């Protein structure tokens, strides 16, 4: 289901300057992630979820994890704000989810994934999540999906606002933003936020029983201008600086983590009636240091420089062509032990086409990546959709993907394996969906086969007590069914989903850890006069915390409730209760979870 009907269903009930003030139908919503160019969501074959700033404000999410866990096909395991977070999209790990900010990939080249605790909600205008492989367009990491966090300024009237709030466990937040036009053809935006909490003990006894808190500061900024009728220039920046406490697995006292993320991108775009072309140069830096009372630790840093030239051409009314060149260089450094190799380049070319004739749509994409460390990888994707009626559509999708070995896998001193190959996947899905005036629904079946999974194994198979190194030894098979529906009953809007997931380690014939076979979500929204209400219930079925499936994690249901009151056109106050029924559950063995908690915020718009 395309998560856009909510704004449409509630728009007639809204006050003019408050929330969900869109007047366009859900099919007119534009997205950019599915095929690397802007297109109406109705033309996207891939399963996509879109979450707007207004929806994030309504549910009063405090982290990106709280937004993602409401979406179909997603399971989230988190230790709370500022703690390690795992995101499983269709049963794949966080390492198999490509994360981008404004279309530029982020994440650590040493760990191989983005740190979701470093991605606060500051300045976010929209989130787009593609479920399923998109490697034929984006290359490595996009086996399970693509998450694009968009902070880019959305044209419209100028706006300025300040927000302050607090809550349980010493939580606080203070932020503000200004956005609007600059001169006759320019625009600018800046958003700042600081937040933190005293927290609670991340782990159970016998681990250290102290509060594990966090504090973050974040800045999002953008300036841009139109040059003539065809050119557009912009500079976008994002900065995060954070500290968090955690409980060390080895019992070291007062373990802490310091992290920073810096992303800047310069973009030049040209467009006319037929052609859209954009050139991007970006720099991304990711730093992390873990330390405690015993050790000062070492700082591990990833620097990624990116250059990308992408194009989209409307050849005829029914035929669109796209393609581009992408180059990026990953560099890593460690103030402690040095890597055997600390730099690698990746050069890629990609092509895509979309053809529509009558009630049919066909898509095809191919990409070639050439990398200094692991050679050449070719990926492809084919998709088709048929409109059975104006309200009913059937679609199918097939493709391949890969995940590059990390610097830790390849070059960590004394334990890296420079002979590693990328993990590879084959992905298939078929879907039936319907779009009606106040009802969207879909049923999707999918299968993914992932080979050459990297795992620790004995260097000498005949000597399991000897040295262990990363090796391509595992295989996984993932099958699932997604059911989604969005509909209105009177003044209530319902967004429901059910996921059946069978994610197996083929070698062990066991379920992959922390993936529930059954999960369900029900989100209800209500808006009338000056009140807005959001209730969510998330069910996560039984799962296992170990590869042998001996440590069972019981099923649980969490309910959150959020309410907003619009005092005036400028002032709003909001309150939220998380874990409404104070459910005591286990998301990860030996880790605590947050009890019932309360939050309140106030926002004033100028």
UniProtKB/Swiss-Prot annotation:
<dbReference type="Pfam" id="PF00593">
    <property type="entry name" value="TonB_dep_Rec_b-barrel"/>
</dbReference>
<keyword id="KW-0798">TonB box</keyword>
<dbReference type="InterPro" id="IPR036942">
    <property type="entry name" value="TonB_rcpt_b-brl_sf"/>
</dbReference>
<dbReference type="GO" id="GO:0006811">
    <property type="term" value="P:monoatomic ion transport"/>
</dbReference>
<dbReference type="GO" id="GO:0046930">
    <property type="term" value="C:pore complex"/>
</dbReference>
<dbReference type="InterPro" id="IPR000531">
    <property type="entry name" value="TonB-dep_rcpt_b-brl"/>
</dbReference>
<dbReference type="InterPro" id="IPR039426">
    <property type="entry name" value="TonB-dep_rcpt-like"/>
</dbReference>
<keyword id="KW-0812">Transmembrane</keyword>
<keyword id="KW-0998">Cell outer membrane</keyword>
<feature type="domain" description="TBDR beta-barrel">
    <location>
        <begin position="157"/>
        <end position="606"/>
    </location>
</feature>
<protein>
    <recommendedName>
        <fullName>Vitamin B12 transporter BtuB</fullName>
    </recommendedName>
</protein>
<feature type="signal peptide">
    <location>
        <begin position="1"/>
        <end position="21"/>
    </location>
</feature>
<dbReference type="GO" id="GO:0009279">
    <property type="term" value="C:cell outer membrane"/>
</dbReference>
<dbReference type="Pfam" id="PF07715">
    <property type="entry name" value="Plug"/>
</dbReference>
<comment type="similarity">
    <text>Belongs to the TonB-dependent receptor family. BtuB (TC 1.B.14.3.1) subfamily.</text>
</comment>
<keyword id="KW-0472">Membrane</keyword>
<dbReference type="InterPro" id="IPR012910">
    <property type="entry name" value="Plug_dom"/>
</dbReference>
<dbReference type="GO" id="GO:0015288">
    <property type="term" value="F:porin activity"/>
</dbReference>
<comment type="function">
    <text>Involved in the active translocation of vitamin B12 (cyanocobalamin) across the outer membrane to the periplasmic space. It derives its energy for transport by interacting with the trans-periplasmic membrane protein TonB.</text>
</comment>
<keyword id="KW-0732">Signal</keyword>
<feature type="short sequence motif" description="TonB C-terminal box">
    <location>
        <begin position="589"/>
        <end position="606"/>
    </location>
</feature>
<feature type="domain" description="TBDR plug">
    <location>
        <begin position="40"/>
        <end position="152"/>
    </location>
</feature>
<dbReference type="GO" id="GO:0015420">
    <property type="term" value="F:ABC-type vitamin B12 transporter activity"/>
</dbReference>
<feature type="short sequence motif" description="TonB box">
    <location>
        <begin position="28"/>
        <end position="35"/>
    </location>
</feature>
<keyword id="KW-1134">Transmembrane beta strand</keyword>
<keyword id="KW-0813">Transport</keyword>
<dbReference type="InterPro" id="IPR037066">
    <property type="entry name" value="Plug_dom_sf"/>
</dbReference>
<dbReference type="InterPro" id="IPR010101">
    <property type="entry name" value="B12_transptr_BtuB"/>
</dbReference>
<keyword id="KW-0626">Porin</keyword>
<keyword id="KW-0406">Ion transport</keyword>
């Amino acid at each position: 289901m395309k998560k856009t009907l909510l704004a449409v269903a509630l728009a007639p009930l809204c006050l003019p300057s408050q929330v969900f003030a869109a007047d366009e139908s859900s099919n007119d919503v534009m997205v950019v992630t599915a095929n690397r160019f802007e297109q109406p969501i109705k033309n996207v074959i891939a399963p996509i979820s879109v979450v707007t700033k207004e929806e994030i404000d309504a549910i009063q999410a405090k982290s990106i994890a709280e937004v993602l866990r409401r979406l179909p096909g997603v399971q989230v395991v988190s230790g709370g704000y500022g703690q390690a977070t795992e995101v499983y999209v269709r049963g794949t790990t966080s390492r198999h989810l490509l994360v981008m900010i404004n279309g530029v990939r982020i994440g650590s080249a040493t760990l191989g994934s983005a740190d979701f605790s470093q991605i606060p909600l500051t300045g976010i205008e929209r989130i787009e999540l593609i479920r399923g492989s998109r490697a034929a367009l984006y290359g490595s990491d996009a086996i399970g999906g693509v998450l694009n966090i968009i902070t880019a300024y959305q044209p419209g009237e100028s706006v300025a606002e300040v927000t302050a709030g607090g809550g349980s466990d010493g939580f606080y937040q203070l932020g503000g933003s200004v956005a609007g036009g600059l001169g006759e053809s320019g625009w600018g935006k800046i958003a700042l936020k600081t937040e933190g909490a005293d927290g609670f003990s991340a782990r159970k006894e016998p681990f250290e029983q102290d509060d594990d808190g966090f504090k973050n500061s974040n800045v999002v900024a953008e300036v841009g201008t139109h040059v003539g009728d065809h050119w557009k220039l912009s500079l976008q920046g994002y900065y995060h600086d954070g500290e968090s406490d955690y409980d060390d697995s080895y019992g070291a006292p007062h373990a802490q983590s310091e992290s920073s993320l810096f992303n800047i991108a310069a973009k030049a775009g040209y467009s006319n009636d037929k052609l859209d072309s954009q050139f991007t140069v970006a720099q991304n830096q990711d730093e992390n240091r873990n330390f405690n009372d015993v050790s000062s630790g070492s700082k591990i840093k990833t620097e990624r420089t990116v250059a990308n030239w992408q194009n989209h051409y409307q050849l005829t009314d029914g035929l669109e062509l796209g393609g581009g060149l992408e180059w990026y260089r990953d560099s890593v450094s460690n103030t402690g032990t040095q890597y055997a190799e600390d730099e690698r380049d990746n050069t890629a070319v990609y092509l895509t086409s979309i053809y529509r004739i009558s009630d049919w749509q066909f898509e095809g994409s191919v990409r070639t990546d050439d990398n200094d460390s692991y050679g050449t990888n070719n990926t492809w994707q084919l998709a088709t959709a048929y409109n059975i009626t104006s309200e009913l559509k059937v679609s199918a999708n097939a493709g391949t993907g890969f995940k590059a070995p990390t610097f830790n896998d390849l070059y960590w001193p004394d334990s890296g394996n420079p002979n590693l190959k990328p993990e590879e996947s084959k992905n298939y899905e078929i879907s039936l969906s319907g779009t009606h005036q106040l009802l969207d629904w879909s049923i999707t079946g999918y299968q993914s086969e992932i080979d050459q999974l990297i795992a620790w194994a004995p260097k000498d198979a005949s000597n399991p007590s000897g040295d262990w190194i990363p090796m391509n030894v595992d295989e996984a098979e993932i099958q699932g069914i997604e059911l989604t529906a969005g509909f209105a009953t009177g003044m209530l809007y319902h967004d429901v989903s059910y996921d059946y997931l069978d994610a197996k380690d083929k070698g062990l014939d066991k379920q992959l850890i922390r993936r529930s076979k059954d999960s369900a979500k029900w989100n209800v929204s209500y808006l009338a006069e000056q009140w807005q209400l959001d209730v969510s219930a998330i069910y996560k079925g039984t799962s296992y915390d170990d590869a042998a499936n001996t440590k069972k994690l019981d099923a649980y249901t969490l309910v959150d409730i959020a309410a907003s009151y619009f005092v005036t056109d400028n002032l709003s106050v909001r309150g939220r209760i998380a874990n409404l029924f104070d459910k005591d559950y286990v998301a990860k063995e030996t880790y605590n979870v947050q009890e019932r908690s309360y939050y309140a915020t106030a926002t004033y718009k100028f």
